[in-house]
Design a protein with these regions (language model features):
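N-terminal amphipathic/basic-hydrophobic helices that include classical n-h-c signal peptides
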Residues: 1-20
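A generic structured-segment signal
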Residues: 3, 33-35
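Cys/His-rich Zn2+-binding cysteine-cluster or related metal-binding knuckle/ribbon modules and their
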Residues: 22-24, 29, 33, 43-108, ...
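Solvent-exposed alpha-helical segments within well-ordered globular domains of core cellular machineries
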Residues: 25-29, 43-47, 58, 62, ...
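Extended interfacial segments that mediate partner engagement and assembly in macromolecular machines
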Residues: 42, 91-160
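Glycine-rich, flexible loop/turn motifs
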Residues: 60, 73, 85, 107, ...
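Long C-terminal interaction/binding lobes of large macromolecular proteins
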Residues: 118, 145-157, 161-217
Length: 217
């Protein structure tokens, strides 16, 4: 029996295919690291990108690069912004006697969408979580304290999520400003326990703001 011969150039094609598979696997791996995206969803997105017009994927890549280069935390409140300070902090029409404290930048967008709140914000960039090894020093709490010391602030609205970590963080902040001239309040009941602010509907959030509970005065 004559031995089978490998067609000329087949090695190059096999290596090229392996490189393509590796690149695809790498993309799927990166996509699966996104919040709420599992391996199956990441695979579906990756194959969709391969089927779309190349101009779309180039535009997507350019947008991802641009947003990382141009968007940064506001030096005042910590919300993501292109200008510094952000539009909210720079708006002289906002109520500067009130600061609403949230966990993440996306929570600001949720509260703004209600058109119910006209004060300022402060983004903690997380919550106190001993299990995760996150303490007060790992958040922007010291910056919040500095803003209060500058004067003019009369109320701090604690809009952390109704979770164990969110409640722990809120309690810490209540004790931090206890005895000061600043009163603290908490969003009223209505948000589901263990839920995230960003998933609540606008009406529920608006009612929670209007009916917030005073914790200290």
């Amino acid at each position: 029996m004559s031995s089978l011969r490998r067609p000329a150039g087949s090695t190059f094609r096999r290596v090229s295919w392996e490189c393509s598979v590796n690149a695809l696997d790498q993309l799927i791996g990166q996509l699966s690291r996104l919040p709420g995206i599992g391996k199956k969803s990441a695979t579906r997105i990756a194959y969709h990108l391969l089927r779309t017009d190349p101009s779309f994927t180039r535009g997507l890549a350019a947008s991802l690069t641009e947003v990382r280069e141009r968007i940064h935390p506001c030096t005042v409140c910590g919300n993501y912004t292109e200008a510094d300070p952000c539009d909210v902090c720079a708006d002289s029409a906002r109520d500067r006697t009130t600061i609403c404290v949230v966990e993440q930048p996306q929570d600001v967008a949720v509260l703004e969408a209600t058109r119910e709140y006209r004060g300022l914000y402060h983004v903690l960039m997380g919550v106190i979580s001993p299990i995760e090894g996150v303490g007060p020093k790992d958040l922007t709490i010291s910056r919040l304290g500095a803003r209060v010391k500058e004067g003019g602030v009369k109320e701090i609205i604690l809009a952390t999520n109704p979770t164990v970590e969110g409640d722990t963080t809120a309690l810490y902040l209540v004790k931090l400003f206890e005895g000061s001239e600043v009163r603290t309040s908490r969003l009223a009941l209505g948000l589901p326990v263990g839920g995230d602010l960003e998933y609540a509907d606008r009406l529920t959030i608006a009612r929670s703001l209007r009916g917030r509970t005073l914790l200290s005065s």
